[in-house]
Amino acid sequence: MSAESGVAALLRLMAWLSPAFPVGGFSYSGGLEKAVEDGRVCDAAGLGGWVETLLRHGSLWNDAVFLAHAWRSSQDTTALSETANLGRALAGSAERYRETVLLGDAFIAAASAWPHAVLELLPKEAPYPVAIGAVAAGHGVPLRETLAAFLHAGVSQIVSAGIRLGVAGQKDGVAILAASEAVIEEIAARAALSTLDDLGSATVIADTAAMRHETQGTRLFRS
């Protein structure tokens, strides 16, 4: 597929990042469940703030950087392997590690419905954003559009988790998605120009919640 095939690229992004794509993203909250239990996120405003913080300064930003680097390195087996190693090393908790690796494995398996040589270049246990970036590049899907779709899917997943945890209603969730559009566009543009030197986060509360979720008693989510 050529980079000019806009409709084909859109259709593939919609398929790959749809909640119906069989990767199991619905079962992860990224520590939000613990933050809700601790009272740190208790309403729609708090959920919206949580989302924006992760986009600008947390795991969603770092994942976008990894995706962009994998997209640019999609034909370089060594670079993809090194990027995957770094992505796994920077997972902030055991659950976060399992989340990104299991989602990556599931994505690669499901993406085999669109055969391409890039699937053979990806290492085992490729983190989710690395897998998406490489596969999107292999199919000629533009980087910035891939980043925007990936970030939107990440926000949607968090919002869905917040709704299931009872801190926001469906109307609130839609409002958060609408309010996040400008931030998603901004972060996608920044990430498209990023290098691995731009990795970094400042979300101690979210990272700590992800760690503490491992010992949470009653829970709905795997992270």
UniProtKB/Swiss-Prot annotation:
Keyword Ligase (UniProt): no
Localization terms from the record: Cytoplasm
Superkingdom of source: Bacteria
Keyword vocabulary terms for this entry: Chaperone, Cytoplasm, Nickel insertion
Pfam families: UreF (PF01730)
Signal in keyword set: no
InterPro entries: UreF, UreF_sf
GO MF, one annotated term: nickel cation binding
Family: Belongs to the UreF family.
Assembly, per entry: UreD, UreF and UreG form a complex that acts as a GTP-hydrolysis-dependent molecular chaperone, activating the urease apoprotein by helping to assemble the nickel containing metallocenter of UreC. The UreE protein probably delivers the nickel.
Protein name, per record: Urease accessory protein UreF
Species the sequence originates in: Agrobacterium fabrum (strain C58 / ATCC 33970) (Agrobacterium tumefaciens (strain C58))
